[in-house]
Amino acid sequence: MNRDNKQELVTQMHERLSRAKAVFLADFRGMAVGQATSLRNELRGASVEYKVFKNTLLDLAAKGTDVECISPYLAGPTAIAISYDDPVSAAKVLSKFAKDPAGKFVLKAGVLSGKLLDVTQIQALADLPSREVLIAKMLGSMQAPATNFVGVLAALPGSLVRVLDAIRAQKADN
């Protein structure tokens, strides 16, 4: 590959890394072809881009982006997973493969919003509910006070009617 091709690859990867919400690095050494194919398919289903990229070129592409802090982890065979939408779903898929006892897939590090994540933090991210579940929970908690307020407002006229009915019944007895 000539210098111009390498420069074009670095430019393309720099643009991808600049757009990324999260980036994860892994060592894929010793993975079976079937397992690697399965990993790629699951990541594709989670809208995650997965590539094996030369470390020196990846280091150059990361310069000037939020993921510049990955440089110390660029040693040995390195695969990069780039998430543009939901970092939690990417972490879930990668953690699942990293936990597989038969596999050789090892997470190295990750970057989320410019912050470096170690393996335990990636596992913690993977344990979070998905984006859709978090949004549903947030909307439910935002809706609860309004629902309670409407319930109180609806109960006030009923309470007034019961009080007036009790007063009418008391006067009727006298």
Swiss-Prot record:
Keywords: Ribonucleoprotein, Ribosomal protein, RNA-binding, rRNA-binding. It holds the Pfam family Ribosomal_L10. GO terms for molecular function: large ribosomal subunit rRNA binding. GO terms for biological process: translation. One of its GO terms (cellular component) is ribosome. The keyword Ribonucleoprotein applies. Belongs to the universal ribosomal protein uL10 family. Part of the ribosomal stalk of the 50S ribosomal subunit. The N-terminus interacts with L11 and the large rRNA to form the base of the stalk. The C-terminus forms an elongated spine to which L12 dimers bind in a sequential fashion forming a multimeric L10(L12)X complex. Forms part of the ribosomal stalk, playing a central role in the interaction of the ribosome with GTP-bound translation factors. This is Large ribosomal subunit protein uL10. The gene is rplJ.
